[in-house]
């Protein structure tokens, strides 16, 4: 389902834990990480689509989360032609998204990446709030910047502490490289339990943070797809 401009209605999900770290999922069979997201089906509201995608991709139910906020307007990104299937080029341009900020009130063991027969992720971890800005694929970066920035005010309102993307001296932190090198992966058939960190993540500093990555076994697709470029409902 595309709008008149060729954008597919979509929802994005920023899930935070008690330390204001964000859920970060590794796309199945690939080396790319992203937030949960997916298309809005005909007749669905954005909120209904969000809860459906949350269960399909992360295995969580409405009682496991609390809605903290959402973006006021649609945020759009265009997908490069090389990532678009040939038969829909010229019609499909990209995604327009409503982003939701959710607070995790359940436990880490409630996260189940294989809740459906077609999992989206095969590993996950908690990352500092601003890390995804530099870790996500480039053509999504501006939308991530807009969504994280707009929704950060809800996090600050609850914690009464600034949530800045800058470290000491105003220098932007070299986030993704260090976090990726310092992450430790462990396997689990059902998503396992992502052990808690001792460090708070209210601000991004120059301190290297060690994060846990939880992996699950899942079949590798025959051809990796770097983005939700096809007009499918379970992306």
Swiss-Prot record:
Function: Accelerates the degradation of transcripts by removing pyrophosphate from the 5'-end of triphosphorylated RNA, leading to a more labile monophosphorylated state that can stimulate subsequent ribonuclease cleavage.
Biased amino acid composition, Low complexity: 203-220
Motif Nudix box: where in chain: 38-59
Similarity remark: Belongs to the Nudix hydrolase family. RppH subfamily.
E.C. numbers: 3.6.1.-
Keyword set includes Hydrolase: yes
Ranges for domain Nudix hydrolase: 6-149
Domain of life: Bacteria
Name of the molecule in the record: RNA pyrophosphohydrolase
InterPro entries (UniProt xref): Nudix_hydrolase, NUDIX_hydrolase-like_dom_sf, NUDIX_hydrolase_CS, NUDIX_hydrolase_dom, RppH
Lineage: Bacteria, Pseudomonadati, Pseudomonadota, Betaproteobacteria, Burkholderiales
UniProt feature, compositional bias: Basic and acidic residues: 171-196
Entry's Gene Ontology molecular function annotations: pyrophosphatase activity
Range of residues in the leader sequence: none
Enzyme class: hydrolase
SUPFAM superfamilies (UniProt xref): Nudix
Residue numbers spanned by region Disordered: 161-235
Cofactors demanded by this protein: a divalent metal cation
UniProt entry keywords in alphabetical sequence: Hydrolase
